A protein has these predicted regions:
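Acidic/His-rich, divalent-metal-binding segments that scaffold phosphate/diphosphate chemistry
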Residues: 1-107
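Short intrinsically disordered terminal tails
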Residues: 1-2, 185-188
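Histidine-centered active-site/metal-ligand motif
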Residues: 65, 97, 115-116, 120, ...
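Hydrophobic side chains within alpha-helical segments
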Residues: 68, 101, 118-119, 171
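An active-site-proximal "capping" alpha-helix that borders the catalytic cofactor pocket
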Residues: 69-73, 113-126
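Histidine/acidic-rich helix-loop-helix segments that form or flank divalent-metal centers
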Residues: 90, 123-124, 128-185
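Metal-dependent catalytic cores of enzymes that make or break cyclic nucleotides
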Residues: 106-111, 148, 152
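Short, conserved loop/turn and helix-capping segments at secondary-structure boundaries
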Residues: 110-114, 157
Length: 188
């Protein structure tokens, strides 16, 4: 069993990070994982448990969700030659897309509805425009919420934004099922 509280985000997502060939983008992902809240390692993907499958709940649920989203985006890239030139950014966005669900300045009981905007802004402010744009639009059509009146997340407009959204959407369906080994790696 994986001890999510005693492993870094970089350790837990090492396989996914290794799928990024571009050293600058890989470094950006690693550096980002060092500055976001460490609790992302052990928190669930959904603080209420309503919006994700069983594998994404409980301790380490968000990490398992990110592993599936990353696998989904890799498969979507393989099936879509038109985005091969954005492979690095799409994989980075899949890894980082939910790393602002539990932001530093907020209570960690519930996930932050504006996490796409927080993540997008962070990436853009660090020179990663494409990754930021992909993260900002990853929630798809769910752009407003009663929990944060007045805030509107970006909706996908470009094809690559839709792919990033679909990778996340599919991994969050309650009927989605997959297995993980004793090291927390996705079993194919």
């Amino acid at each position: 069993m994986v001890d999510y509280k005693n492993k870094s985000l970089k350790e837990l997502l090492a396989f996914e990070i290794a799928q990024i060939d571009d050293i600058d983008i890989r470094d950006f992902v690693n550096e980002t994982l060092e500055v976001v809240e460490p609790c992302h390692a052990w928190k669930p993907a959904s603080s209420t448990g309503k919006y994700h499958p069983k594998f994404a709940s409980g301790e380490g649920g968000l990490i398992r969700h990110i592993k599936v989203v990353t696998r989904n985006i890799i498969e979507l890239i393989r099936a879509t030659p038109a985005v091969e030139n954005e492979k690095e950014e799409l994989i980075a966005a899949a890894i980082l897309h939910d790393m602002w669900k539990y932001p530093k300045d907020r209570d960690h009981e519930f996930t932050a509805f504006d996490h796409p905007a927080l993540g997008g802004d962070y990436c853009k402010s660090h020179g990663q425009e494409t990754i930021g744009r992909l993260i900002a639009a990853h929630q798809g059509i769910w752009v407003t919420s009663k929990v944060l009146p007045g805030h509107v997340n970006e909706a996908p407009k470009k094809f690559d934004e839709w792919l990033c959204h679909y990778a996340d959407l599919l991994a969050s369906r309650p009927y989605y099922s997959c297995d993980f080994d004793e090291n927390g790696e996705l079993i194919l």
